[in-house]
Amino acid sequence: MFNTYTNSLQWPIRSRNQQDYCSLLPERSESYKLSKAYTSSRCYCVSSRSSCCCCCSTPSSSSFVKPKVLINPGFVLYGVRQSTLIQWPSFQRRLLVGGGRLMGCEVYSSCDGIRRKNRSFKLRCLEESDECCGGRSCSDDVEAMISFLSEELIDEERKWNLVSRVKEKKKVGNVRKVSVEGSNSYGNGRVSQRVKKPEGFGRRKEIKEDVKLNERYDCEHCGRRKKSSELESESRRGSKLVTGEYIGKSYRGDEEREVRPRRRKSSSCSSYYSLASSGEFESDTEDQEEDVEIYRENVRSSEKKVVDQSAKRLKSRKEASQMHSRKKRDESSTGVDSRYQKQIFEEGENSNQAVTLNQRRRKKFSQTENRVSESTGNYEEDMEIHEVHVNDAETSSQNQKLFNEREDYRVHSIRNDSGNENIESSQHQLKERLETRYSSEDRVSEMRRRTKYSSSQEEGINVLQNFPEVTNNQQPLVEERISKQAGTRRTTEHISESSEIHDIDIRNTYVSQREDQIRNQEVHAGLVSGLQSERKQQDYHIEHNPLQTTQSDRTSVSVSHTSDAVRYTEIQRKSEKRLIGQGSTTAVQSDSKVEKNGAQKEDSRLDHANSKKDGQTTLGLQSYQSKLSEEASSSQSSLMASRTKLQLVDLVSEEMQGSETTLIPPSSQLVSRRSGQSYRTGGVSIQEISHGTSESGYTTAFEHPRAGASVNSQSAGELMGFTSHEDAMGSAHRLEQASEKYVGEFVKKAKHGVINPETEEQRAESNQLKRRDSRRSSGGSGAKGPSDEMWVTDSAQGTPHPGATEGNAAVGNAIFKRNGRSLWNVIADIARLRWGSRAGSPDSSAKPAGRSSPNESVSSATWFSGREHDGSSDDNTKGDKVLPQEAPSLHQVEVGQTSPRSQSEYPGTTKLKQRSERHEGVVSSPSSTILEGGSVSNRMSSTSGNQIVGVDEEEGGNFEFRLPETALTEVPMKLPSRNLIRSPPIKESSESSLTEASSDQNFTVGEGRRYPRMDAGQNPLLFPGRNLRSPAVMEPPVPRPRMVSGSSSLREQVEQQQPLSAKSQEETGSVSADSALIQRKLQRNKQVVRDSFEEWEEAYKVEAERRTVDEIFMREALVEAKKAADTWEVPVGAVLVHDGKIIARGYNLVEELRDSTAHAEMICIREGSKALRSWRLADTTLYVTLEPCPMCAGAILQARVNTLVWGAPNKLLGADGSWIRLFPGGEGNGSEASEKPPPPVHPFHPKMTIRRGVLESECAQTMQQFFQLRRKKKDKNSDPPTPTDHHHHHLPKLLNKMHQVLPFFCL
């Protein structure tokens, strides 16, 4: 140690070479890695007469130094080179601490140190040397140098005053101030630092540190020498800006730091050892503290770059956002969505930029941490070297403090990193949410991002950056703002969804309206086409039938009134949804198809028939629109009358007895069976059964939904679709055409019995009308559809009567056999046999001329057209012939025919009376028809098993025509033929000839019913002018089948009571002039019975439905009552119903709420008023399990409750007759006492419906069970078990055990 000191001390004094190596070159330290980065390898001494500026020495000094001593350039003063310290001034020794600070120097003016990071040091060495020294170094005397150094240290101690103040002031906003005051006192290397932790976050702004050191020392041997050195160290330390990206606030802080180095006073010594041993030698810990300060400055400088870079970007983004906000104000017309998207985009951009800035800052902090770790390692190495020289405990304690301080710094940096990581993770999550939520806005975001970046480059504004802690504190605010934005977005989405739903509703409404318009246009087109064809046919038939003009006029007038009815018919047709064929077409389409097949005659007939059907349909629809509450009886009867024209009646052979009959329930029975009146002013309509094309190419319009304008059954709101075989229907059609020419002759023969002069005048006109009706019937009456029920049986053979004419015989002899192809051939055979028997049979009934009774019959043409003709027609004097020939097991009917009267008398003499009938008809069950045509009425009704057409005319024969029941539905029901019910026959007598049909002359039909049997040569039966209308039962009636109505048994009971008068008159057989009057009275009685029965039935159905609904809601009230019982309240529950929905519930809460008014009814009224937002509870129904008390009754009346339904009576406090009566009389068997006065009439709510006793037993049982349980509970509470007995039994046992244990312890 001594040698090292001596050699190293002498060499620098004698050094005169110009270019000598520095004695502290980094090459000497093999282990120091960063030496080349901070120091220069050479020190140039330009003047040989001047010594190097404190750091230069010859390489010979290396020979005097031990070779492998590690020297850290940052701490040069450590180790064996302390001799150099003796020659250096104190300020140079301070500046050299910190690693390579002054390794290259120029003697002339300054020694420029190394620029570390953001710090630059300038050293100006001003030398003023006296001439006495001659520019040379001091004396060679070491002792003189030591004394010089001692004096220098003393002067230095006196003059040393280093004050470094750092002041930061920034005005950013209303934020907290930060002040950091640190003072370092370098006394014996101790460092004490006083730091005030920042209350907020501040910005350190442009710290200038001026260090001025003036030293003066005298050289005793060489005279006075003044050397002043001034060190100016200016470092612009990085400023830290704390910006809250989401709060936009900054903080202001002041930091003041005072470093006052102190030294121990020591006396000068004459030797180096005394100097070192006295402890006055400057401690190396000062350099360590300097290094700590330098490290802090380095950290600050490193943060400065990060802050500067991020601040610029954030400030530019802030300015860009401001620009966007201005743009948004200018572009406010774009709407809420654009503004909302911009706001979301700005938030996303800020979060993304914050994430990138945090990543960069994290990288910088990681680099700083690396440097901290490296400096820590270096510090440990230096401590090892320092421990060789400094061994006292005080120095080690100081080093320990410094080390702890360094560790605090490391912990602080680690916390910063962890905070950054947390912020980064949270911001990553935020970024992911925003990206997933707004992925559809990537393009717009990219464009705006480019705009912002360009604006940021143009602006170039410094933006403040926030600390990690600020971001950490800001996170709740960010989340709150995000939640608000999410709520705003949900609101916007809800508004958009509601607008879309509104648009969809508008579109649907438009589409439905458009469909209605198209439908109406098509219907009108069909009507117009029908009218055009009708006008064409009118020109052809106007000469033959002048009455056709009147019919066409009526049709044209009624067209304008039928659009609404047609629309309603179309809607009802859609609701019924018949399973019908796919080949139905309109009447116009059928016309075109017929033209293709090339039947000109049939085409003209079809056009004519279609035109008439259009007119008749429009009239029917008009009547339907006027009386929608009427039944389908008129439609059925008219259809049955049209069937009469075809004579499709009870023709069943014995072959058919074992076969099955297909009964197809009508659609009207399946749906509503409601139809309107059908005013038929003219034209005979027949029922067409085919739906395909026959051999002649005939088509029908049964099934097409838009041919409804010409469909007669659609006037009743029914689509009569019936599938049949083409060939069978074609044959029937051809047969009908062939029979047209025989209609006139048949009418003449039917009325051959009596000839009236007045009828002879009308004969030609009647024949023409019949021909026209026949053509219309054959042309296209299929559009009118079949009746409500259609029966289909096997074919039977029949032979015409030999007395028939040639044409009739030819037709009648045509026997059609079943070919096995299908069941529809049966219909053709029946039709042929019907027409043949009709043409060939001379059997008829007629009555003499005179005033006709209401039961007198009319011709088949009258049945179809609905007209009543003049009594002057001689056809009325002719007896109507019953045509069926007696054949084995053939069903026959009695038909009386009269010629029609002139149409001019029709409007004044004819009225259509229709009876509203839902399901059943006159006698037994639905779908039977009775047509009564009289001078005053033409009533049509429907019966299940019977279809009786009775036509009464002023002048004409009397007859009853029994039609088979017909049905039309989607799925036919197969029933045995014997289940078909026929009306009982009528035993009729004549006034003139008094001819009666004996039982032998009757033949069995169906189930054994007997009808009069007519022979070919038999004279026509002359029926009395006033005959009984009701049928006479020749044999006991057979039980009738129940087809549709569930109450047909009741109707059968009514039916059994009807024919009593008929039986009595049949037994007596007396024919008197007053019989018609008696029969009329009986019919009125029957009609009253039927009407009252229907009313009863309807009322019963309504009551049953209402009772079911009441029971459903009353059970809900019972549920509420059980809730009250669970809490030991009186089990009374109530529900309030509005439009079929429960809007309020309540149960008794008197005990729980301690409120005497908290009854179930009161709670329901309160909640219902809240639900409806009105104290008026109109159109509501209150269901209560117990009869209301007076308080609740007053509240119910005051709330204007429409209906009250209660269950069990309240015998003590009931306000509905049990105690007092406050409600008006209602329904049910409530507690009504005769002695109670009538209830007062409420002035504002006089009409109120009360229904009593709904689920009375259940409600009463609930109350009884509750009171029984409560009495049991009271009994248990009144007699509780005495607790003394329980303890009394246990106490002696305890004492006994204690006595047993005591001897054990004593032993």
From Swiss-Prot:
User: What PROSITE patterns would the database entry show?
Assistant: CYT_DCMP_DEAMINASES_2
What name does UniProt use for this protein? Answer: tRNA(adenine(34)) deaminase, chloroplastic
List the catalytic residues.
E1161 (proton donor)
Summarize the record's disruption phenotype note.
Loss of cp-tRNA editing, decreased chloroplast translation and impaired photosynthesis.
What else the UniProt entry mentions is:
Since the absence of A-to-I editing is compatible with plant survival, a limited two out of three codon recognition occurs in chloroplasts, although this mechanism is less efficient than wobble pairing.
Q: Where is this region: Disordered?
A: 245-377, 439-458, 544-563, 576-618, 753-807, 837-957, 975-1073, 1268-1293
Please give the catalytic activity noted in the UniProt record. adenosine(34) in tRNA + H2O + H(+) = inosine(34) in tRNA + NH4(+)
Question: In its keyword annotation, does this UniProt entry include Zinc?
Answer: yes
Q: Write down the Gene3D superfamilies for this protein, in alphabetical order.
A: Cytidine Deaminase, domain 2
Task: Please provide the record's keywords in A-Z order.
Answer: Chloroplast, Coiled coil, Hydrolase, Metal-binding, Plastid, Transit peptide, tRNA processing, Zinc
HAMAP family recorded for this chain?
tRNA_aden_deaminase
Q: What is known of its domains?
A: The C-terminus (843-1307) is sufficient for the deamination.
- Known EC number: 3.5.4.33
As listed in the record, the transit peptide stretches over 1-55
UniProt biased composition (Basic and acidic residues): 293-321, 439-448, 592-615, 760-771, 866-883
Gene designation: TADA
Instruction: State the species of origin.
Output: Arabidopsis thaliana (Mouse-ear cress)
Q: Which GO terms describe its biological process?
A: tRNA wobble adenosine to inosine editing
What does the record give under GO molecular function? metal ion binding; tRNA-specific adenosine deaminase activity; tRNA-specific adenosine-34 deaminase activity
Function summary: Deaminates adenosines to inosines in tRNA-Arg(ACG). Exclusively involved in A-to-I editing of the prokaryote-type chloroplast-tRNA and not involved in C-to-U editing.
- Where Zn(2+) binds, per the record, is at H1159, C1189, C1192
- Residues forming the CMP/dCMP-type deaminase domain are 1108-1230
Skewed-composition ranges (Polar residues): 367-377, 546-563, 582-591, 852-863, 895-907, 924-947, 1045-1073
Q: Into which family does the record put it?
A: Belongs to the cytidine and deoxycytidylate deaminase family.
Annotated InterPro entries: CMP_dCMP_dom, Cytidine_deaminase-like, tRNA_aden_deaminase
Q: How is the cofactor bound?
A: Binds 1 zinc ion per subunit.
